[in-house]
C-alpha cells in the first residue's frame, strides 16, 4: 500500500507522554509504525504538552530518530489555540527551550500570543517550526 504521509493524533498528553483511555501509549508502540512511514512523513501529536521540559525533548528525539520522519507536538496545554508547536527531524536536536510551557501550571486555551500558536482548525505546520 501507499505510505502514510501525515498522521495526526488528537487526544491527551503530558510531558513526554501520549495518553489513550487513561493509559500512556509506550514510545515502542509508536515506533512500530515505522514501516508505514517515509522520511517525508509527518507525525503530528495534537495533544497537550508532549514536547514540554527535558522529558518532552527526549521524547521528541526518540520519536523522530526512531520513526525516521518529522514529529510535531506542543509544549503548552492546547485547546482552541494550540501553542508551543514545534517539529523535530531525525538526527537533530530540539530547537526550543525546555522551560517553554512550564512557567504556568494552567492557562486558558484562548491565548493566541503564546509562542508558535495556531488555531485548532489549521491543518499544516508553518515552515521552520
Q: Which residues are covered by each model-predicted region?
A:
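Glycine-rich short-loop/terminal segments
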Residues: 1-17, 120, 127-129
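Caspase-like cysteine protease fold
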Residues: 73-129
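Catalytic cores of nucleophile-dependent amide-cleaving enzymes
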Residues: 6-83
Amino acid at each position: 500500500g501507499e505510505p502514510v504521509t501525515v498522521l495526526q493524533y488528537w487526544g491527551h498528553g503530558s510531558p513526554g507522554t501520549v495518553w489513550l483511555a487513561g493509559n500512556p501509549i509506550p514510545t515502542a508502540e509508536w515506533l512500530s509504525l515505522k514501516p508505514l512511514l517515509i522520511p517525508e512523513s509527518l507525525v503530528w501529536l495534537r495533544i497537550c504538552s508532549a514536547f514540554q521540559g527535558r522529558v518532552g525533548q527526549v521524547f521528541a528525539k526518540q520519536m523522530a530518530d526512531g520513526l525516521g520522519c518529522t514529529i510535531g507536538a506542543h509544549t503548552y496545554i492546547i485547546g482552541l489555540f494550540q501553542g508551543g508547536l514545534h517539529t523535530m527531524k531525525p538526527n537533530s536536536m530540539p530547537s526550543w527551550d525546555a522551560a517553554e510551557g512550564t512557567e504556568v501550571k494552567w492557562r486558558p486555551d484562548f491565548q493566541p500570543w503564546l509562542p508558535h500558536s495556531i488555531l485548532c482548525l489549521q491543518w499544516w505546520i508553518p515552515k521552520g517550526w
